[in-house]
Curated annotation (Swiss-Prot):
GO MF terms held by the record: ATP binding; glutamine synthetase activity
Annotated organism of origin: Pisum sativum (Garden pea)
Pfam families (UniProt xref): Gln-synt_C, Gln-synt_N
Family label: Belongs to the glutamine synthetase family.
Extra remark beyond the main annotation: In pea there are distinct isozymes in leaves, roots and nodules.
Name of the protein this chain belongs to: Glutamine synthetase root isozyme A
Length: 357
């Protein structure tokens, strides 16, 4: 095994100019991540200089077998924390051979929204809080939980320390460091309310980069849990009953919100979000009705609300934002399995571009 370990950690840059590029894309379910690697003649830092590629879309539920070719368009580059050296991770979106975006390509429409002059002028910032649950392989049960049983009730696990409270910290810390190495703007991690559940935060990130970074961070997390023999779940309510669900809260601000008088801009934006509540809920993740019950720090899925420091509301405004008269707000509705391209662009579209009837 030592020879295998040596090869896994082998530094290619000592012997060749060639690099390995791992092309990453979203599969047919909208949450599954796929990837494959190719050799390139030398280092690349601009995604526009990377070659397009293709794959068998019939094996990812994205194309029929009789016309299975799907084209990968490179969009963002990150350093590869697994192969290191000059090797890279490449976030791609997917198109037909004729250049039409596939239905699962949510980046395409998001990029159009973020390139709109009115949106670009507002320099939208996002901070995404990605929650997830670590599961024991083969039994679909949270890490650290007794098989067929339950741990003690919630209370000591949030930001908890100790072998009886924090399950999987090595995975979480490895992911944190790997994301920093990759160039992802990861800003923190913490243990969550339900044991076996964790959160990482990405941001502040501007526009489309928030979605690119979340997908890259999810990919790295999937790879690390693969190595650890643990399964990561983005299900918004993995365990029924008196246990917290998993969300992906989206913190958002525009240039106008961050300037003096921004609190009034925030309140107008929240009013718009309330008027389009149903449209947002429909796009905020599958199975979210199991999570947004009005309990466990959530709002009822059918009722829009907002408040200052209220974690039981749809939209939360921080005390500092209220006091300073400017800042940001938090949309607490997105589920952990949301598509970050959809959520970030929809918030920008509603608050900046959409006009009240």
């Amino acid at each position: 095994m030592s020879s295998l370990s040596d090869l896994i950690n082998f530094n290619l840059s000592d012997s060749t100019e060639k690099i390995i590029a791992e092309y990453i894309w979203v599969g047919g379910s909208g949450i599954d991540i796929r990837s494959k690697a190719r050799t390139l003649p030398g280092p690349v830092s601009d995604p526009a200089k990377l070659p397009k590629w293709n794959y068998d879309g019939s094996s990812t539920n994205q194309a029929p077998g009789k016309d299975s070719e799907v084209i990968l368009y490179p969009q963002a580059i990150f350093k590869d924390p697994f192969r290191r050296g000059n090797n890279i991770l490449v976030i791609c979106d997917v198109y037909t051979p004729a250049g039409e975006p596939l239905p699962t390509n949510k980046r395409y429409n998001a990029a159009k929204i973020f390139s709109h002059p009115d949106v670009a002028a507002e320099v939208p910032w996002y901070g995404i809080e990605q929650e997830y649950t670590l599961l024991q392989k083969d039994i679909n049960w949270p890490l650290g939980w007794p098989i067929g049983g339950y741990p003690g009730k919630q209370g000591p696990y949030y930001c908890g320390i100790g072998a009886d409270k924090a399950y999987g910290r090595d995975i979480v810390d490895a992911h944190y460091k790997a994301c920093l190495f990759a160039g992802i703007n990861i800003s923190g991690i913490n243990g969550e309310v339900m044991p076996g559940q964790w959160e990482f935060q990405v941001g502040p990130s501007v526009g489309i980069s928030a979605g690119d970074e979340i997908w890259a961070a999810r990919y790295i997390l999937e790879r690390i849990t693969e190595i650890a023999g643990v399964v990561v779940s983005f299900d918004p309510k993995p365990i029924p009953g008196d246990w917290n669900g998993a969300g992906a809260h989206a913190n958002f601000s525009t240039k106008s919100m961050r300037e003096n008088g921004g609190y009034e801009v925030i309140k107008k934006a929240i009013e718009k979000l309330g008027l389009r509540h149903k449209e947002h809920i429909a796009a905020y993740g599958e199975g979210n009705e199991r999570r947004l019950t009005g309990k466990h720090e959530t709002a009822d899925i059918n009722v829009f609300s907002w408040g200052v420091a209220n974690r039981g509301s749809s939209i939360r405004v921080g005390r500092d934002t209220e006091k300073d008269g400017k800042g940001y707000f938090e949309d607490r509705r997105p589920a952990s399995n949301m598509d970050p391209y959809v959520v970030t662009s929809m918030i920008a579209e509603t608050t900046i571009l959409w006009k009240k009837p």
